[in-house]
Amino acid sequence: MMTSCEGVDFINNDDVTWQYCPTFAPAVLFAVLFSLTTGSHIVQAFTFKKTFSWVVIVGGAWEAIAYGLRAAGAKNIYQKGFGLPHHILIALAPLWINAYVYMVLGRMVHFFLPDKRCFGISARRLTVIFVCLDILAFLTQGASTSLLNSDTASTVKIGINIYMGGIGLQELFILIFIGLAVRFQYKMAIVERTEHSKGPWRPLLYTVYATLVLITIRIIYRLVEYSGGLHSAIATNEAAFYILDATPMFLALFSLNIFHPGRFLVGPGSEFEKKPKKAKKRKNKNKSGSGKWVLDDDGQGHFEELPLDERV
């Protein structure tokens, strides 16, 4: 059922979840654009065999679904089943893209640097730390979404403060991470003077920088938007939303299509190796009495079959 926005009071009407009348055409356009870039990421994940790319695929899918809901909401502004999920997905989707960038640089440190470390921290640990920090920002922002859609002004204000705190945390983590990226770039410059690099790394690193800048643009926009409340001039400006939120996120995903990590992280060491199982755990798997576990000098060990007359 198509509804008109004519005469609707978007400030005082609790039956609508929009700050203004959403436009149908641009919502459809970005739903298609995000669907295309996400579809490309799915194909590339299989082509380059980068299983960790599921993270960016989720982010792109959330964006595509969000704009599909926005298009549907433009036809029926009173249907909260369109508005509420849209706001949640739009708020949280960029955090998946952010996490993916953290994972990409972690693998670059692991693959390109001989010591596989940055600031003395292993590549695997760096990745885990920043993904966990991203999850913290995700949970903080996620906790605010239900409050932002409350009918009570005081609750909405609390939601705004929590959300701004969450994206503030996200930006703080990004700035720290950029410091790590700069350190990686410095170490790679030294590596290139002393030995051959495993392959081109600058295009992928510059893509990491660009993606973080695009996410930062979106964060600054959101901070300015919510600092004036849900009905400020910028919060009710749809053009600003598409220019400073939708477009940066699409460009971030698209740039990761063009300079996909799978094009640069190729061969042995391009992925984190699976951690070896501990000898004790392996020993417990052999309770049949047909052999014994012998510990090697490297701490790993091997299983030796016992003669038939010595088996339990």
Predicted regions and their residues:
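Seven-transmembrane alpha-helical bundle of G-protein-coupled receptors
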Residues: 27-37, 53-66, 90-103, 130, ...
